């Protein structure tokens, strides 16, 4: 099972780096890959984990003064197919999450 999450964060410089480290910490228990500037493909084992991540991101947004907006797709139990232009190895990491649910 996997889903996609993307966000906008209105912060710059070292503050942005610090906040992005906190986002990575929220995601760290889960296998995930970051593609593009703020686009993640995340593997989860249950819809409960999806909800836990959603609540953690909401809490993160409430705890900071900067604007933080995000979108999470619904959990997908089927193998995913994504298209676009990335480096070849980038697709291997995405497929490891989306194809081998």
Explain the meaning of each model-derived region.
Residues 20-24, 28-31, 36, 43-101:
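Charged interaction segments
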Residues 5, 40-43:
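Short cationic amphipathic helices and targeting signals
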């Amino acid at each position: 099972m996997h889903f996609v999450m993307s966000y906008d964060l209105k912060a710059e410089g070292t503050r942005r780096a610090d906040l992005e480290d906190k986002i990575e910490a929220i995601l760290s228990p889960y296998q995930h890959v970051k593609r593009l500037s703020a686009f993640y493909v995340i593997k989860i084992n249950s819809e409960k984990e999806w909800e836990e991540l959603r609540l953690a991101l909401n809490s993160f947004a409430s705890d900071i003064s900067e604007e933080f907006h995000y979108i999470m797709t619904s959990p997908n139990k089927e193998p995913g197919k994504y298209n676009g232009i990335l480096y070849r190895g980038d697709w291997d990491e995405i497929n490891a999450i989306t194809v081998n649910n």
